[in-house]
Amino acid sequence: MFLLVAGATCYFGGNGFGADVMRPLGLRDVRVGGEIGRRIEVTITNNLLVLDADRDFLPPFKAKSADTGYIGLGKLIDATVKFAAYSGDPRVDALRRHLVAETIQAQEADGYIGLLAAPHRVRGMWDVHEMGYLIFALLTDYQYFGEERSLAAARRAADYLVQRWPTLPADWCVGTDVAPHVAATGLERTMLALNRQTGDGAYLDFTLKTRQLPEWALPIVVGRRQGIEGHVYAYTARCLAQLELHRMQPNPRLLRQTERALDFMLQHDGLHITGGTGQCEIWTDDQDGRGDLGETCATAYQLRVYDSLLRLNGDARMGDLIERTLFNALFAAQSPDGRRLRYFGPTEGPRAYWPTDTYCCPCNYRRIVAELPAMVFYRTAAGLAVNLYTPAEAKLAVGKDVALRVRQETDYPNTGRVRLLLDPARPVKFPLQLRIPRWARGATVTVNGKPAAGTVKAGAFFAVTREWKPGDEVTLDLPMTWRLVKGRQRQAGRVALMRGPQVFCLNPAQNPVLAKLDGTELGYLAIDPASLGTPVPSDVVRPGGLACKVSFWKPGFGLGNKADYELTLTEFPDPDGKATYFRLRDFSVAAEDELLAGRDR
């Protein structure tokens, strides 16, 4: 192990070198239900398949007349390819083929794929960013569907960038008003993927020598400054590229930027209770919950970094972070019906939808939702690990290539009961690992109705190793108690209500007596913990979802025994939620955020 700085917490275990301890299943090998599956479905049917790519995405790439600009076509194609692979839906596949064909047709003879006129190419604002994701998407199309023309087009575009790069002036990005790593967000990961796919060392050399990915060591820059160096999305995207390079060329130095980001989020107030980070797309540590909080692009890349670290070392906290983030920050970035998407997800005050289907956040939302099926189950060296609890089915090989089908049955996060039904082709011995969230103290595991051997520890994976036979059943019970989680910095002295991985919020529209109050005014209400009872049904966020009936006192000096209001709190993705933190009469019942346990300060 290593530490980033003296006194910092280390988030990497003993597998600093070598192969991953977990590997994701293929998108075609998993089927997901529950709220995760519903979000996948509505993103496909109510968003992807109803947007107008021929009007909003493709024309600028045919015209090539702009001097600056960004669309997000590469991100759209990448999401469409993955949705097509996962769903097998012929409508999605037709869209994939159309987008890819139109993009390749728009490619110029020299390899350029973009929307800028010749004098502005590469050096123009976001041109490298756009091209990098187009190359990545075409490569994704080849990887999932074997389209040779997509691979050829990706290579031509990458070669164009590699060849043009030496012609750029040293200060080329100054005119873009952003730092060099921000202007080229995503490029290094694209080049590494091309190198792995083709074996062409030119792409690796470009990443190592020209882009100098191993040397990147930018500190956390708090606040929006010239060059926006503290851009969370750009920062985490480059962290992800370093992690992937570490898999190819193991070096502890390549872990340090990710360590730095985790240290800031978990130890120094960079992470909000919903899993979102940063104001105005930039690292911040004051826990301001209003306005432009938690850019969706950053949320998507945080999830990818957590997934990468989970695979690298099997740290259950990364699974906890994935779960917290997707049920709150991520799903709050989408309307419940799937059609509208957000750039930001504040915990206080009004939330706004992005007005178009283009640009980075809507497209990165689609991409990360398309990747969620691969975050449910993971292969381990000897068996299977379950990371996310949701109705799901998977097929894989365990032991010496023994075919296994596994099915999850659960209404999680409504309750904490999860049934796993295992159906191996023949009896086979392997470890089944279950992630036990940090909040789930007192969790129990039974196998065929009998308690599993060993201690079930919150915040770790619990392994059941035995010879599994067709029809074996594992039942996991996670205690789902209410938690009043302490706020920090600007939220100090107040608490947020949580149950399992979910954060709950106050929507004035659901509580007419408060309809005219702003999020700040709502935050002055004091919650009565004694009034917390069994959750009640609510379809505001999802069919079969939950809400909480709870009593509150008005602001004031008295705070008598009888509460002033009985209000309904809804799940955080409620589109009209305006308050998340509330006052508390007796702070002794408040709890620390379990994800931040072990904070240095």
Task: List each model region and its residues.
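Aromatic (Trp/Tyr) and acidic
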Residues: 16-90, 94, 121-145, 181-202, ...
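C-terminal beta-rich recognition modules with glycine/proline-rich loops and embedded aromatic residues
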Residues: 43, 258, 319-328, 333-421, ...
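Aromatic-lined substrate-binding rim segments of carbohydrate-active enzymes
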Residues: 91-107
